[in-house]
Amino acid sequence: MSLASGDPLGDPQSWGSAVHNWLAVSRRFGWAPAVVGVSDAGARAFADRGMGVISLGDEAVLDADAFSLNGPDMAPVRQAVRRVRRAGVEVRVRRHEQVDPAEWPGLVRAAEAWRGDAPERGFSMALGRLGDPADGRCVLVEAVDAEGDLVGLLSFVPWGPTGASLDLMRRSPDAPNGVTETMVAELCRQRESVGLRRLSLNFAVFRSVFAEGETLGAGPVTRMPVSYTHLRA
C-alpha cells in the first residue's frame, strides 16, 4: 500500500499532476493507493483522478477568540458552567513547562486512576503520555474543587503557532457535572495567557452516521447497515 497523509504539498493548481504522478508510481510498484486526513479541496483533487472519497468523521474546532457562552444554543453549556462555578471549582491554565516537576506524579496518578479499568482507546495522533519533559509547550488545564482537590484535567498538544489539539481528557467520578465543559470554557477565556486562538476538541468518527442512527431510532446493530451504506457511497 502507498498511504498518503493530508493534502498534496505545493501550489493547489499543481495538485492534480502531483496526484496523477503518485498514482502512476503506485501502479508501477503494485501498491494500493490510499489517503487519509484531507481537506475538501484535497478530496476533490484525489476524486478528480478517480479515487473514491469516504467521510470518516468531523473535527470539532473552536475559535477561541469568538467563543461565547451567550445565546440559546449554548444554554446547556452555560448552565453547566454556572453549576460548576457555584460548587467552588476553579480552573488553572498553564504550559507543561510551567508545572513544577514535583506535581507530575500526582497528575499522572489521577489521570490513570480516573480512566479506571477501561483500556486506552486514544487516537493515532495522541501522544499517549503525560508529563514528559519533551512536551513543555503542551497546555495543561486543571479543575480544582473548593477543598483544593484536583477533579479534572485536560492536556492539549501544540497545533501550529496559535492552536492546540486535545490530547487527554480526564475527570474525577466525584467531580460536579459539567466540569469538562467548564475547563474548555475557561481555557477559551484565559487563551491569551498561553497564546491560543484555535482549539481542536478531537475527532468524531462517523459522526453523521451515528447522528442519522439517532434520528431513525437505530440501535448499535441496526446502525451497521447505515454505516456500510455510507462506506459504499
Regions found by a protein language model. Name each.
Residues M1, G37-A47, M51, S68-P72, ...:
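A conserved beta-strand-loop-helix scaffold within acyl/acetyltransferase catalytic domains
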Residues M1-M74, R78, L187:
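Soluble catalytic regions of membrane-associated enzymes that act on cell-envelope
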Residues I54-L56, R85, G195:
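A short, structural micro-pattern
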Residues A80-R86:
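Short, conserved catalytic or adaptor-binding loops enriched in Gly and charged residues
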Residues E212-Y228:
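Acidic, Ser/Thr-rich peripheral helices and adjacent loops at domain boundaries
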Residues T229-A233:
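Conserved small/polar residues in nucleotide/adenosyl-binding loops
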